[in-house]
């Protein structure tokens, strides 16, 4: 079984903040000592960090749940609980992170050492020392810690390569990579010998270097899942230049030009932006019989598809096995790379807004009200539910504080407008209370 894995589904959960403490100072010679309960510590966040030493998402095959630790509770003497350490999760360069529920891209991790907070730890609850006022110098109020963010994620690895080799199976892509770099891809006289992407570093005679990826062979219908389908097409997306390798010997009975058209159709069907990348046509196996005649016919058919003012794609006749024509191909590839900018995979509009993702963005409605089948009024909403879980329901003063917060948010008035009467049941999560008008 291959040890290469380029997709994974995982869950991450940040740590909960520690609960605040209700405590009072009781010492000899210190009458009316007042509140002395400290704050809870913050929960640990889940952070993704890029490690250029990783080449696959294989580590996520069996380890799919990542949970950061919670913060410590507040203590007496006004001491705060210790904040939890963040959980660092290492991912390979080129990892795209999506929210599994919405499909939106959260981040695209491409730089070594790059860090992104994927799930933010909850803040610690405030201790009663925070709630002392001249009117209430000894409050019995403390907050629970805020729950940490919890997310279901989809990870997708798109390898970082400057140049991608595409073409039908057995056209010589792996052989080409093996002779121009130190990579050792599997090579065989049968289709789909390459079943995972291979990456190699290429250095030209003039001193330029670039990363080249050999991708599993495509066949007609790949964009709809035929053959290996789109399983590895994603890896072409980060390349800046495409080397389109064609078996000019037609050893398998196919027409080289039809191969060229077919592969380009698959690239365009999969992703229109793939065709924006400059292509170099690599006419391989030129040491074979009939290759020269096939190349002449290929050039004639290609020219017929272009306007006389259009620039034809560059064509380089080579033989990977005989090591012929490789230097010119590599020099031209390096020159093309030098004048080709990177292609952004995701516009800013594609990425989840960080404030919205973590729930910091202002919204028009902080809560919603529905009438359940049992006539109970059900309250929901991110802000409202966050206030609820941070309320210590075992303390009367905390409950009264929560009631004031609801009133300040306009919940009472909204319930009246919806027709709520004195004594009606109101539910938040599993907690129920009576509406008092």
From Swiss-Prot:
Keyword Translocase carried by entry: no
Residue ranges annotated for the Obg domain, each copy included: 2-160
PROSITE patterns, A to Z: G_OBG (PS51710), GTP1_OBG (PS00905), OBG (PS51883), OCT (PS51881)
Enzyme class (EC, first level): hydrolase
Record-listed Mg(2+) binding positions: 174, 194
Span of domain OCT: 359-437
Record's signal peptide: none
Superkingdom of the source species: Bacteria
GO cellular component, one term: cytoplasm
GO biological process, one term: ribosome biogenesis
GTP-binding listed as a keyword: yes
Any matching Pfam family: DUF1967
Compartments where located: Cytoplasm
Keyword set, alphabetical order: Cytoplasm, GTP-binding, Hydrolase, Magnesium, Metal-binding, Nucleotide-binding
Record-annotated OBG-type G domain positions: 161-338
Cofactors: Mg(2+)
Record's subunit section: Monomer.
Similarity comment text for this entry: Belongs to the TRAFAC class OBG-HflX-like GTPase superfamily. OBG GTPase family.
Annotated protein name in UniProt: GTPase Obg
Organism lineage: Bacteria, Bacillati, Bacillota, Bacilli, Lactobacillales
């Amino acid at each position: 079984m291959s040890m290469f894995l380029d997709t994974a589904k995982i869950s991450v959960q940040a740590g909960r903040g520690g609960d605040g403490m209700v405590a009072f100072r009781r010492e000899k010679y210190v009458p009316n000592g007042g509140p002395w309960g400290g704050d809870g510590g913050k929960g640990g966040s889940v952070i993704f960090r890029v490690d250029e030493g990783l080449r696959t998402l294989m580590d996520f095959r069996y380890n799919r749940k990542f949970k950061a630790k919670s913060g410590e509770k507040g203590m007496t003497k006004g001491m705060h609980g210790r904040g939890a350490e963040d959980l660092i999760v290492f991912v390979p360069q080129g990892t795209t992170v999506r929210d599994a529920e919405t499909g939106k891209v959260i981040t695209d991790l491409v730089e070594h050492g790059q860090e992104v907070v994927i799930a933010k730890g909850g803040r610690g609850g405030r201790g009663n020392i925070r709630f002392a006022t001249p009117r209430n110098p000894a409050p019995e109020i403390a907050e629970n810690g805020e729950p940490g963010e919890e997310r279901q994620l989809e990870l997708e690895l798109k390898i970082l390569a400057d140049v991608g080799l595409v073409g039908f199976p057995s056209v010589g892509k792996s052989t080409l990579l093996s002779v121009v770099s130190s990579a050792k891809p599997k090579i065989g006289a049968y289709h789909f010998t390459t079943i995972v992407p291979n990456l190699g570093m290429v250095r030209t005679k003039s001193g330029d270097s670039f990363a080249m990826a050999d991708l599993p062979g495509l066949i007609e219908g790949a964009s709809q899942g035929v053959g290996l389908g789109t399983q590895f097409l994603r890896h072409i997306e980060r390349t800046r230049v495409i080397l389109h390798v064609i078996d000019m010997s037609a050893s398998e009975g196919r027409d080289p030009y039809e191969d060229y058209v077919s592969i380009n159709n698959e690239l365009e069907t999969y992703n229109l932006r793939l065709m924006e990348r400059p292509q170099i046509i690599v006419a391989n196996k030129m040491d074979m019989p009939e290759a020269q005649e096939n190349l002449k016919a290929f050039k004639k058919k290609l020219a017929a598809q272009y306007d006389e003012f259009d620039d034809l794609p560059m064509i380089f006749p080579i033989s990977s096995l005989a090591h012929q024509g490789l230097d010119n191909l590599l020099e031209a590839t390096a020159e093309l790379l030098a004048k080709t900018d990177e292609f952004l995979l995701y516009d800013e509009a594609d990425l989840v807004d960080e404030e919205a993702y973590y729930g910091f963005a202002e919204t028009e409605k902080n809560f919603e009200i529905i009438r359940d089948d049992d006539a109970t009024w059900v309250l929901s909403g991110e802000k409202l539910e966050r206030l609820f879980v941070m309320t210590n329901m075992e303390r009367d003063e905390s409950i009264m504080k929560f009631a004031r917060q609801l009133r300040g948010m306009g919940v009472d008035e909204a319930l009246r407008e919806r027709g709520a009467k004195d004594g009606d049941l109101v539910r938040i999560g599993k907690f129920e209370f009576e509406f008092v008008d």
